[in-house]
């Protein structure tokens, strides 16, 4: 917890350059685009919502890492549609590896800079 607060003091997102915060559980990954100036969550995406879509279409099983990449890609497209090109990436104290790295790669492939 102390690590989170230390990181949060240094990172402050605003409307032109919002903060993308990640929460990772054992099963799912969640990402939120936050405007810290107003304290609002602008956009959110999660693997929970995307998995429902895949189950309805009865496609092949997808790994958590692939799902994280798709979440990043989807969130990136939505952010780009709002006209935002730069973001602050808040990995929330998680190591930049695996699912966190895949989500960041998905955001970067859309053209976002951080």
Swiss-Prot record:
InterPro entries: Ribosomal_uL18_bac-type (IPR004389), Ribosomal_uL18_bac/euk (IPR005484). It holds the Pfam family Ribosomal_L18p. GO terms for biological process: translation. GO terms for cellular component: cytoplasm; ribonucleoprotein complex; ribosome. GO terms for molecular function: 5S rRNA binding; structural constituent of ribosome. Transmembrane segments: none annotated. The keyword Ribonucleoprotein applies. Disulfide bonds: none annotated. The keyword Kinase does not apply. Part of the 50S ribosomal subunit; part of the 5S rRNA/L5/L18/L25 subcomplex. Contacts the 5S and 23S rRNAs. HAMAP family: Ribosomal_uL18_B. Belongs to the universal ribosomal protein uL18 family. This is one of the proteins that bind and probably mediate the attachment of the 5S RNA into the large ribosomal subunit, where it forms part of the central protuberance. This is Large ribosomal subunit protein uL18. It comes from Aster yellows phytoplasma. The lineage of its organism: Bacteria, Bacillati, Mycoplasmatota, Mollicutes, Acholeplasmatales.
């Amino acid at each position: 917890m102390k690590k989170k607060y230390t990181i949060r003091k240094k990172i402050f997102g605003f409307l032109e350059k919002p903060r993308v915060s990640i929460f990772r559980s054992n099963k799912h990954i969640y990402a939120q685009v936050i405007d810290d100036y107003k304290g609002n969550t602008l956009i959110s995406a999660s693997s929970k919502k995307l998995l429902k879509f895949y189950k309805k279409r009865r496609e092949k099983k997808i790994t958590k890492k692939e799902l994280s990449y798709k979440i990043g890609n989807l969130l990136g497209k939505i952010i780009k549609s709002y006209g935002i090109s730069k973001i602050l990436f808040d990995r929330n104290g998680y190591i930049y590896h695996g699912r966190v790295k895949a989500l960041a790669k998905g955001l970067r492939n859309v053209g976002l800079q951080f």
